[in-house]
């Protein structure tokens, strides 16, 4: 019967279908020839839930118990099983029949005639009423003729299960119609439609196969409805798969676990008859977990005394591939046979072991079902095989106790072989452990083992340095002071364990780029001339640190890393690239050296204190501050530093130093403003009424470049003891009479090219002067010079680089010049009896006290 004939018959039957409301017998029900039916309700009052009940009693057959979960149907509708009346939990009642029967002639007139023409008993409850929720025309062209067949008749046509108890072998036949979606159209009986659900699922399975749905080959719903399909397909199959079971017994727990899954993905499309009859499904294969390969699994043993791995006896063994190792915890002796791959397209990959079973494929012809089964089995083997790429388990000989390095000669070794050259290349990329993240490690070769290398080097250096010390103690836990300078150390990982109680640690002149690994209880830490950057300069945990030297490093930001150390007293950060003075925090430091950095602009200490927002510590405790050799052009409010005693501003292009705050600093004792390049023009306190008064009246030491304002100051600090003026003009020199009120004992006037002589009354103006430094001036007359010197107090005299000490080009010889220097020395000694040191040339001239 062709498709056109089917459509014609179906259309003729649908012509008799009427949708008119039937006659009413009573308010809620009506009858047709004595049968009582539910009243037909309008669409607005119709409830879809009346035809979607899934709750059934256990007495119902397997074919209607568990409708499969159809995830994708290519927009085709599903078939729902209507539960017979008389069961609890359903929407049907005992006195009602399906609505559609009343619209067909001959149904319900006491004969109980079924749609298929079979005659049943009048009192028989229909086993099932199908409700197909979509247009029938959607299935035209794909519906088969003999669709709803008797379930028992189909069972009789299937291939029976053959069980061989001696060999424990089960033979199951498969039909190629399953793969081709060709259903059997033999002459089955149309008497009674006792199990149409399974047949309906077969129809939809054929639709999905023909329409190329997203069901994968080998994936089939593993429920009770599939039993009929598998049994029908077995009729036309002459090829078989022999399954050698070592253990057919399955526990109850395994059955329950298997039935919880809706689908099964396996290489075989059919199940064994024993499984189909009991509702069991094949257990889903799982890949064995991958185990981590450690040095201990390679035979190495860690030596805690030497801090290294002891190599195994078979150290020369080369493991060329990680697949040669068994990473699973299973016992391979339990598996009898492995599935052969058969073809060359597997590229030599090892076959997978399948749950203690050996599968033997008996058909190899390309046209047979067994051949296709074999191909599908091989694809599953490749999918389930452990082909995860792993690097070869490698171990560097540098980390072993012997520390030997094997040299590879001859042929080239593969990238997976263990070779020292490969290992050393890997370690070159892993020198900076803190910059790497553990989550980025994807293979064994990327694991950073530089910790063991550093600790080994550290132990060697400690042994060599401590053994030469007279106070050497074999117990390293008692060591309090260690000097590891010039050791070419890159980091200090492991030192906390080796030297837990060290207090003074010198790590200068190494190659460190981080402070990690240094014992946190250290009090004095010297790390100058390394490669430490601001990103890896963390002082968190160094709560007892008091002295820190990080000079000659790569620090390039601010002082925020110092804020965590509250007990810091001395910090040397010279010769870095620090750009800001912010972030000092509440550390109570006293000495801070920031010379030779990249600090620029105007420094306002009042603003720094407000920004720091620290009641105690920070800038409020600084006593010695060195800002020399930066790019500072202005300084303001030095008086805001209440404890500042020494300030060094040499080597900056300073233009002005101005005090504008009301605070007065009575602690500043030394101020140095030299080598400004002649830019200095203002040194003034705007809060003082007398602008001719020096701004800092408690100074003892003042060193500065000569500028015009010096000659205008009339009141110098009474406490001034050392005055040094470098450069400028003679007219800008201070008046010596204004210095009479000071306690000056050392005066330096250097590099003033137009300064030709001392004032005549110098001995009266500076009666307590002991040191007179006059290098690089234009002093020409020795007799005038000696007459103006303070006779009783001068002990040190420096006359270098003046005309009276420099030989002229027309002089006869060097010996003559030497005799003139001796005469000058005699005059100075005669004028100043207390003179102890006289500098006339690069070497001190002989005096009466040192002859």
Swiss-Prot record:
The modification Phosphoserine is found at residues 417, 419. The modification Phosphothreonine is found at residues 388, 392. GO terms for cellular component: nuclear envelope; outer plaque of mitotic spindle pole body; peroxisome. Phosphorylated from S/G2 phase until the end of mitosis. Residues 8-21, 291-304 have a biased composition (Polar residues). There is a cross-link at residue 357 (Glycyl lysine isopeptide (Lys-Gly) (interchain with G-Cter in ubiquitin)). The keyword Kinase does not apply. GO terms for molecular function: signaling adaptor activity. It holds the Pfam family LRR_6. It is found in: Cytoplasm, Cytoskeleton, Microtubule organizing center, Spindle pole body; Nucleus envelope. GO terms for biological process: astral microtubule organization; cell division; establishment of spindle localization; initial mitotic spindle pole body separation; meiotic chromosome segregation; positive regulation of exit from mitosis; regulation of mitotic cytokinesis; septation initiation signaling. Residues 1-31, 216-352 are annotated as: Disordered. SUPFAM superfamilies: L domain-like. Residues 223-246, 260-278, 320-333 have a biased composition (Low complexity). LRR repeats lie at residues 544-566, 567-588, 589-609, 621-642, 643-664. Keywords: Cell cycle, Cell division, Cytoplasm, Cytoskeleton, Isopeptide bond, Leucine-rich repeat, Meiosis, Mitosis, Nucleus, Phosphoprotein, Repeat, Ubl conjugation. It comes from the Eukaryota. Interacts directly with MPC54, CNM67, SPO21/MPC70, ADY3 and ADY4. Probable component of a spindle pole boby (SPB) complex composed of ADY3, SSP1, DON1, MPC54, SPO21/MPC70, NUD1 and CNM67. Involved in astral microtubule organization by binding SCP72 to the outer plaque in a cell-cycle dependent manner. Required for the mitotic exit by facilitating the binding of TEMP1 to CDC15. Also involved in the pathway that organizes the shaping and sizing of the prospore membrane (PSM) during sporulation. PANTHER family: PROTEIN NUD1, PTHR47566. Present with 892 molecules/cell in log phase SD medium. This is Protein NUD1. It comes from Saccharomyces cerevisiae (strain ATCC 204508 / S288c) (Baker's yeast). The gene is NUD1.
């Amino acid at each position: 019967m062709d498709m056109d004939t089917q459509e014609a018959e179906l259309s003729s039957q649908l012509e008799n279908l009427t949708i008119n409301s039937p006659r009413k017998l009573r308010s809620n029900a009506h009858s047709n020839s004595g049968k009582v039916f539910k009243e037909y309700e309008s669409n607005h009052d119709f409830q879809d839930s009346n035809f979607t009940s899934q709750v059934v009693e256990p007495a119902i057959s397997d074919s209607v118990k568990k409708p499969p979960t159809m995830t994708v149907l290519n927009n085709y509708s599903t078939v729902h099983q209507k539960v017979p009346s008389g069961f609890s939990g359903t929407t049907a009642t005992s006195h009602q029949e399906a609505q559609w029967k009343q619209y067909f002639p001959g149904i319900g007139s006491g004969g109980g005639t079924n749609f298929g023409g079979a005659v049943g008993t009048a009192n028989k409850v229909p086993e099932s009423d199908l409700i197909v929720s979509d247009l029938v025309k959607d299935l035209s062209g794909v519906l088969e003729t003999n669709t709803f067949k008797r379930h028992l008749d189909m069972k009789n046509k299937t291939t029976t299960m053959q069980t061989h108890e001696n060999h424990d072998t089960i033979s199951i036949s498969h039909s190629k119609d399953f793969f081709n979606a060709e259903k059997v159209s033999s002459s089955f009986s149309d008497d009674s439609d006792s199990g149409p659900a399974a047949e309906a699922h077969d129809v939809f399975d054929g639709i999905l196969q023909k329409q190329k749905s997203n069901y994968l080959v080998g994936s089939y719903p593993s429920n009770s409805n599939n039993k009929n399909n598998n049994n029908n397909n077995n009729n036309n199959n002459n090829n078989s798969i022999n399954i050698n079971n070592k253990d057919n017994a399955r526990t109850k727990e395994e059955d329950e676990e298997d039935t919880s899954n809706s689908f099964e993905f396996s290489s075989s499309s059919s199940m064994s008859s024993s499984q189909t009859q009991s509702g069991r499904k094949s257990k889903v294969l799982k890949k064995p977990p991958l185990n981590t390969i450690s040095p201990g699994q390679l035979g190495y043993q860690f030596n805690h005394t030497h801090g290294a791995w002891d190599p195994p006896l078979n150290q020369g063994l080369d493991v060329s591939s990680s697949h040669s190792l068994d990473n699973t915890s299973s016992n391979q002796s339990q598996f009898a046979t492995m599935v052969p791959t058969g073809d060359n397209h597997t590229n030599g990959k090892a076959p997978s072991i399948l749950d203690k079973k050996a599968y033997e494929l008996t058909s190899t012809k390309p046209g047979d079902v067994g051949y296709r089964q074999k191909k599908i089995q091989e694809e599953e083997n490749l999918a389930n095989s452990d082909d995860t790429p792993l690097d070869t388990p490698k171990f560097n000989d540098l980390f072993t106790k012997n520390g030997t390095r094997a040299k590879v000669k001859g042929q080239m070794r593969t990238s997976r072989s263990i070779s020292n050259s490969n290992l050393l290349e890997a370690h070159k990329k892993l020198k900076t452990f803190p910059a790497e993240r553990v989550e980025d490690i994807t293979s064994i070769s990327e694991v950073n083992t530089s910790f063991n290398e550093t600790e080994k080097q550290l132990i060697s250096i400690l042994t060599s340095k401590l053994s030469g010390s007279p106070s050497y103690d074999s117990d390293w836990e008692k060591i309090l002071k260690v000097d590891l300078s010039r050791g070419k150390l890159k980091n200090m990982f492991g030192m906390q364990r080796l030297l837990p109680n060290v207090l003074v640690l010198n790590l200068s002149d190494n190659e460190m780029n981080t402070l990690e690994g240094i014992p946190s209880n250290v009090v004095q830490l010297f790390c100058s001339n390394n490669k430490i950057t601001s990103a890896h300069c963390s002082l968190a945990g160094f709560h007892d640190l008091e002295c820190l030297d990080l000079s000659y490093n790569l620090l390039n930001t601010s002082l925020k890393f110092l804020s965590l150390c509250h007990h810091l007293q001395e910090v040397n950060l010279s010769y870095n690239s620090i750009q800001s003075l912010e972030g000092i925090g509440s550390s109570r430091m006293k000495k801070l050296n920031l010379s030779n950095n990249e600090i620029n602009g105007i420094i306002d200490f009042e603003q720094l204190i407000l920004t720091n927002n620290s009641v105690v510590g920070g800038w409020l405790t600084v006593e010695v501050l060195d800002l020399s050799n930066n790019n500072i052009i202005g300084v303001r409010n030095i008086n805001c530093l209440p404890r500042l005693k020494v300030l060094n501003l040499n080597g900056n292009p300073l233009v002005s130093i101005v005090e504008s705050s009301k605070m007065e600093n009575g602690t500043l004792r030394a101020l140095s403003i030299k080598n400004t390049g002649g830019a200095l023009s203002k040194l003034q306190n705007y809060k003082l009424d007398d602008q001719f008064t020096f701004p800092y009246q408690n100074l003892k030491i003042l060193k500065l470049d000569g500028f015009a304002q010096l000659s205008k100051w009339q009141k110098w600090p009474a406490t001034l003891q050392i005055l040094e003026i470098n450069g400028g003009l003679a007219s800008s020199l201070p008046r010596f009479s204004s210095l009479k009120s000071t306690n000056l004992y050392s005066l330096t006037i250097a590099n003033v090219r137009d300064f030709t002589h001392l004032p005549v009354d110098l001995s009266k103006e500076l009666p307590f002067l002991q040191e007179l430094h006059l290098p690089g001036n234009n002093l020409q007359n020795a007799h005038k010079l000696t007459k103006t010197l303070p006779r009783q107090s001068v002990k040190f005299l420096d006359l270098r680089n003046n005309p009276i000490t420099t030989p002229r080009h027309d002089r006869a010889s060097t010996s003559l010049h030497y005799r003139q220097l001796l005469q000058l020395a005699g005059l100075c000694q005669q004028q100043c009896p207390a003179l102890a040191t006289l500098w006339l040339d690069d070497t001190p001239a002989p005096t009466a006290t040192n002859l």
